[in-house]
Amino acid sequence: MENIISQENLVYKKPTLMNNVPMHYCPGCSHGVVHKLVAEVIEEMGMEEKSVGVCPVGCAVFAYRYLDIDWQEAAHGRAPAVATGIKRLWPDRLVFTYQGDGDLACIGTCETIHALNRGENIVIIFINNAIYGMTGGQMAPTTLVGQKTSTCPYGRQPELHGYPLKITEMAAQLEGTCYVTRQSVETVGAIRKAFEASMAGKGSSLVEIVSTCNSGWKLSPVKANEWMKENMFKFYPKGDLKDTI
């Protein structure tokens, strides 16, 4: 029997929390990668039965289809308010929102800032791809200066459209936040750290994940990743902006 069965070191496996269903995201989209990272962290922490996610309006509106945990859908931009209610009702739960730049940094700016300022023990996962992906590639609050979209075809002009909103830098200045960081899709450690801080009752955490939208950017997945590294990271540098944990 020992000659037939050989011991192997497991390098990778699909998280058991990931449902076996096709994703609706465009090929090359970063959302699928981030979903996997979130699932891995929840499993590592043993919080499968005590996690509650709040879905946004936007490309990730169907996130509840893909991770086998409890979910609640929220009205556009209101995910932090919904998460606040859930966490106050069930303080022993790991409660997080999963939001894009339009949902969080435009229509949901009020709910986001005030939840963070109150120090609600929730985690906000913020996907920043600098464009509105679901509705056709319009300019977002985070669209870079000079970046072309369907609603600013000549590029974002500060004198006309204003400057890109650095919502994460704003969050770092608030008294209620304990951990604010900006990372990219290869950084799983930041998500776990934020989840652990939430469960310890240390305050609000915001994890921005700089991502791609190859469909909205009109680039191939490979070119989109290159563009992200060459342009996005210059204006949205990676790293911890606040850490009081």
Residue ranges of model-derived segments:
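Thiamine diphosphate
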Residues: V57-G133
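Short coil/turn connectors at secondary-structure junctions
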Residues: V21, M47-S51, W90-V95, N117-V123, ...
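Conserved thiamine diphosphate
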Residues: K13, A140-G201
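Glycine-rich beta-alpha junction loops
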Residues: V57-C59, N129-I131, T187, V210-G216
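Short catalytic-loop micro-motif centered on adjacent basic/acidic residues
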Residues: Y25-P27, T97-Q99, C178-S184, L206
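Glycine/aspartate-rich loop-and-adjacent alpha/beta segment that forms the canonical ThDP
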Residues: E2-N3, A190-I191, A197-I245
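Active-site diphosphate/adenylate-binding microenvironment
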Residues: S6-Q7, K14-A75
